[in-house]
Amino acid sequence: MTDVTTSTENELRELAERGAAELADASAEELLRWTDEHFGGNYVVASNMQDAVLVEMAAKVRPGVDVLFLDTGYHFAETIGTRDAVEAVYDVHVVNVTPERTVAEQDELLGKNLFARDPGECCRLRKVVPLTNALKGYSAWVTGIRRVEAPTRANAPLISWDNAFGLVKINPIAAWTDEDMQNYIDANGILVNPLVYEGYPSIGCAPCTSKPIPGADPRSGRWAGLSKTECGLHVS
């Protein structure tokens, strides 16, 4: 295994390019094994705690793997409960990342309900900036985004260089369909956020998440009525 902690950006970019070419048709398990082989303990798995599919798979490859959760201060109670259950059930180390300011401090400084007045700035302060800081300690991050989730994710690669955060990005289940997800959940008894079964196929912060209309893409319930469709973490 290459010591990625001393690798240059160009070397990591080249590694991502080689991986993308060699694993174009790889399974999720193969992608996770490739990640572990090349990055050892220097990668993190990001989870929004909608379900624990990726967490469970990663824990089988590397027990005790770091699992990053962005605790924005605006999550549903069910999401926080799922985070706590994930930490209790799976062999992982949950890294709970919080913004610089609490919601109360942000309200005092910028006014209440910034999420309604300027959702882009709210996401930047409570998601993008904290994630940027948290990822500085890693050479790669693994995410659970899937191509079927929204048009903005339709071309999500399996492995790439993430220009926004300056590290390698692996999306092991990018090619999975909703049926693939449900089959894996059923076959392995995976923890799922109870809100999923209440009609929320995409779960973010409570003030900015609603149930999508039938037939709409799963993320249409996020920032409903606004042109905003992504929080800034997954820039295509």
Swiss-Prot record:
Keyword Disulfide bond: no
Catalytic activity of the protein: [thioredoxin]-disulfide + sulfite + AMP + 2 H(+) = adenosine 5'-phosphosulfate + [thioredoxin]-dithiol
Active site, renumbered: C231 (nucleophile)
InterPro entries tied to this protein: APS_reductase, PAPS/APS_Rdtase, PAPS_reduct_dom, Rossmann-like_a/b/a_fold
Gene disruption phenotype: Deletion of the gene confers cysteine and methionine auxotrophy.
Broad enzyme group: oxidoreductase
Pathway assigned to this chain's UniProt record: Sulfur metabolism; hydrogen sulfide biosynthesis; sulfite from sulfate
GO cellular component terms listed in the entry, alphabetical order: cytoplasm
Entry's Gene Ontology molecular function annotations: 4 iron, 4 sulfur cluster binding; adenylyl-sulfate reductase (thioredoxin) activity; metal ion binding; phosphoadenylyl-sulfate reductase (thioredoxin) activity
Keywords: Cytoplasm, Iron, Iron-sulfur, Metal-binding, Oxidoreductase
Coiled coil: none
Cross-referenced SUPFAM superfamilies: Adenine nucleotide alpha hydrolases-like
Positions of [4Fe-4S] cluster binding: C122, C123, C205, C208
GO BP term, example: sulfate assimilation, phosphoadenylyl sulfate reduction by phosphoadenylyl-sulfate reductase (thioredoxin)
Main location per the UniProt record: cytoplasm
Cofactor(s) the record lists: [4Fe-4S] cluster
Subcellular location per the Swiss-Prot or TrEMBL entry: Cytoplasm
EC number(s) on file: 1.8.4.10
Free-text comment on the cofactor: Binds 1 [4Fe-4S] cluster per subunit.
Homology family: Belongs to the PAPS reductase family. CysH subfamily.
PANTHER family linked to this entry: PHOSPHOADENOSINE PHOSPHOSULFATE REDUCTASE
Described function: Catalyzes the formation of sulfite from adenosine 5'-phosphosulfate (APS) using thioredoxin as an electron donor.
Protein name: Adenosine 5'-phosphosulfate reductase
